[in-house]
């Protein structure tokens, strides 16, 4: 069984923020694949399923998302290497897309929570959301909407990452990485 997790914060207040790009990708996957909702509360998140693939949007808020993922992992007996986490990354320029297995949390509180609850060897799909001018602005930056110019590219970016995630269901990580990685939004056709 494969588990895709999109990191984000619940509620309309956060819906279109940089931190919620993972939720947007999960929504795209669920729509594209016709996955059905199997739980809104039992796993501290919205959980969807089609065949042997699960899609999770934790509703615990970003900093506690590891709890939700751990619950789903244990209930469905999912191996760590079969978990794919989609998240924002301020260390990448807007529109960059990177894939990797394991690694540190890089200051991302959602990843910090995951690492504490399930370990580090899951696959990460990192989506660049740009970086604020000063480190002290990070919390405000990720909790705000994309710029008007960036908003115009979000749909294409989300579709690209969604397609990459679908490829991960049948292709190996290195092959997906070589085909779908982007240095910035300019690399998106």
Swiss-Prot record:
Keyword ATP-binding: no
Chief location: cytoplasm
GO molecular function: peptidyl-tRNA hydrolase activity; tRNA binding
Keywords per UniProt: Cytoplasm, Hydrolase, RNA-binding, tRNA-binding
Active site per database record: 19
Catalytic reactions on record: an N-acyl-L-alpha-aminoacyl-tRNA + H2O = an N-acyl-L-amino acid + a tRNA + H(+)
Coiled coil residues, start to end: none
UniProt site positions, description: Discriminates between blocked and unblocked aminoacyl-tRNA: 9
CDD domains linked: PTH
UniProt site positions, description: Stabilizes the basic form of H active site to accept a proton: 88
SUPFAM superfamilies given in the database record: Peptidyl-tRNA hydrolase-like
Positions with a binding annotation for tRNA: 14, 61, 63, 109
Stored InterPro entries: Pept_tRNA_hydro (IPR001328), Pept_tRNA_hydro_CS (IPR018171), Pept_tRNA_hydro_sf (IPR036416)
EC identifiers of the protein: 3.1.1.29
Subunit-structure text: Monomer.
Entry's family note: Belongs to the PTH family.
HAMAP family from the UniProt entry: Pept_tRNA_hydro_bact (MF_00083)
Protein name as catalogued: Peptidyl-tRNA hydrolase
Source organism (scientific name): Sulfurovum sp. (strain NBC37-1)
């Amino acid at each position: 069984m494969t588990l895709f997790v999109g990191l984000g914060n619940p509620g309309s207040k956060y819906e279109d923020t940089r931190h919620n790009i993972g939720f947007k990708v999960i929504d795209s996957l669920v729509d594209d694949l016709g996955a059905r909702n199997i739980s809104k509360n039992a796993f501290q998140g919205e959980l969807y399923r089609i065949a042997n693939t699960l899609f999770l949007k934790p509703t615990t808020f970003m900093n506690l998302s590891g709890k939700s993922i751990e619950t789903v992992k244990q209930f469905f007996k999912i191996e760590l290497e079969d978990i794919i986490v989609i998240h924002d990354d301020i260390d990448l320029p807007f529109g960059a897309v990177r894939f990797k297995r394991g690694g540190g949390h890089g200051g991302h509180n959602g990843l910090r929570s995951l690492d504490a609850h399930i370990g580090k060897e899951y696959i990460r799909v990192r989506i660049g959301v740009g970086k604020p001018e000063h480190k002290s602005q990070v919390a405000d930056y990720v909790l705000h909407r994309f710029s008007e110019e960036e908003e115009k590219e979000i749909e294409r970016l989300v579709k690209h990452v969604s397609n990459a995630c679908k490829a991960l269901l049948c292709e190996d990580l290195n092959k997906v990485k070589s085909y779908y990685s982007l240095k910035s939004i300019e690399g998106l056709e």
